[in-house]
A protein has these predicted regions:
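N-terminal small/polar-rich segments of proteins
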Residues: 19-90, 119-147, 151-157
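Processing junctions and N-termini across compartments
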Residues: 12, 92-93, 116-117
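Solvent-exposed, low-complexity segments and loops of surface/extracellular structural proteins
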Residues: 112-114, 122
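N-terminal signal peptide c-region/cleavage motif recognized by signal peptidases
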Residues: 13-17
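Sequence contexts marking disulfide-bonded cysteines in secreted/extracellular proteins
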Residues: 96-103, 122-124
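Sec-dependent N-terminal signal peptides
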Residues: 4-12
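Secreted/processed peptides and extracellular or luminal domains of membrane proteins
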Residues: 103-107, 128-130
Length: 157
């Protein structure tokens, strides 16, 4: 068989079913893939001479902003009246919420976090979130060791 005839037969057989494309336009979208946010927590609560002070600071390790949260007690009445309860429920630290970059924080009472500090204090699009303690209840707690456990992380609206 002639090679030319064979090529023509193959082209005719496969080319006959080729689709006709009519361009209507283009669709274009740019997506951004960001690196995972790394957080660092630094608790520094203390009681000296029956005066509570210190706080807990959570920050992004690279200074980037994120939606940050930290657990506080359900008895928290607002960002200027936070409650942080120890694991036994015997001591409550009282303070306020601070957010980096001048962000105004919020309380999400619908959050269901683990432990005694089960609602979320939040800072949207901030590099840091902190609880700042100024007092405690009871004012003169019994001598002993008190452990404060607060969940922290990022959230999506």
């Amino acid at each position: 068989m002639n090679k030319m005839i064979l090529c023509a037969a193959i082209t005719a057989a496969f080319g006959a079913n080729a689709a006709t494309y009519t361009r209507a336009g283009d669709v274009e979208q740019t997506i951004e893939i960001t690196k995972q946010v790394q957080l660092q927590a630094m608790p520094s609560y203390k009681v000296t001479d029956n005066k509570a002070s210190g706080g807990a600071l959570v920050k992004t390790t690279d200074g980037s902003t994120a939606n940050l949260y930290i657990g506080v007690a359900p008895a928290s009445k607002g960002v200027n009246s936070l409650r942080i309860v120890d694991t036994t429920g015997a001591l409550t630290l009282i303070g306020s919420l601070g957010c980096g970059k001048g962000v105004v924080g919020n309380i999400d009472s619908s959050a269901t976090l683990a432990g005694n500090n089960s609602i979320a204090a939040t800072c949207e699009n901030a590099p840091t979130i902190a609880t700042l303690v100024t007092s405690m209840d009871p004012v003169s707690p019994a001598p002993g060791r008190y452990t404060f456990k607060q969940e922290y992380g990022t959230y999506v609206n």
